Amino acid sequence: MALIVPDSAEGFILGYIVGTDTPEALTIRLFDNNYTPTETDVVSAYTEATGSNYAGISLNTPANWTITDGAPSLAEHIQVSWTFDANASQIGNVYGYYVTRDTSNDLVWAERFTNGPYNIQTQNDQIRITPRLTAN
């Protein structure tokens, strides 16, 4: 499934560009409800995974992003990963990820795994994601 930037995020992203909105810190999170992202989504459409040493991961270190101009241009973060502990079976199926703004908790983008869901059941099971955005 393609990455979805919801309609609600397009407004504040444009605001960043023209200086009418202030950027916020971002966190990437896993969702475990069987849901396909849409352009009309808000953050409450997603059920964040819980348990087994899981926590959202900050995307706020500028040095972890690489921007490449081109057609399309690319913003790519270093790979983030979650390694689950002995209680991994608490997680179960993970269908994708979503990114939120930290202060307002707005949804920024989401993506359902094309080869998922990933069934987390065993200690040391991992999910790895390389967040990337393109603009053309």
Question: What is each of the regions a protein language model found here?
Answer:
Residues 1-95, 101-136:
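Small cysteine-rich, disulfide-bonded extracellular modules of the LU/uPAR three-finger superfamily
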